[in-house]
Swiss-Prot record:
Region WY domain, annotated ranges: 57-121
Functional description taken from the UniProt entry: Effector that enhances P.infestans colonization of Nicotiana benthamiana leaves. Induces a weak Cell death response in N.benthamiana. PexRD2-induced cell death is dependent on SGT1, suggesting that PexRD2 is recognized by the plant immune system. Interacts with the kinase domain of the host MAPKKK epsilon, a positive regulator of cell death associated with plant immunity, and perturbs signaling pathways triggered by MAPKKK epsilon.
Factors inducing expression: Expression is induced during host plant infection.
Principal location listed in the UniProt entry: secreted
Primary gene name: PexRD2
Protein name (database record): RxLR effector protein PexRD2
Signal sequence residues: 1-20
Subunit structure: Homodimer. Interacts with host MAPKKK epsilon (via its kinase domain).
Family: Belongs to the RxLR effector family.
Originating species: Phytophthora infestans (strain T30-4)
Amino acid sequence: MRLSYVIVVIATSFLVTTEALSTNTGVQAANVVGPAQRLLRKHYTAAENDDDSEARALNTEKMKTMLKAGMTVDDYAAKLKLTDKIAAAANSARAMEKLGETLKMKKLLRYLNYVAEHTAV
């Protein structure tokens, strides 16, 4: 026998044993039966036309009257019931970041900035 025939026989047996020439057309994938509900995250935003939002908003006039009445930033934090939450979040940057996203904390920071701007050192 010639050497080329031996190589062809070896190559053929190799292809057969490794199933490289397999005729199996079965796809091994999950079958989709029907539409399924996807769990997507949705971030809700405040409505633009909310009537209560202006009543609860901390505007310049309210901050001015609070400062004239002698309300300190600590007093305002106590009024918003944030003192315990701030103390609890003081050791964790993640907790403080989460607290900073709340409406009450934003109000407190706005009042803090107002007091810092309008109080002489």
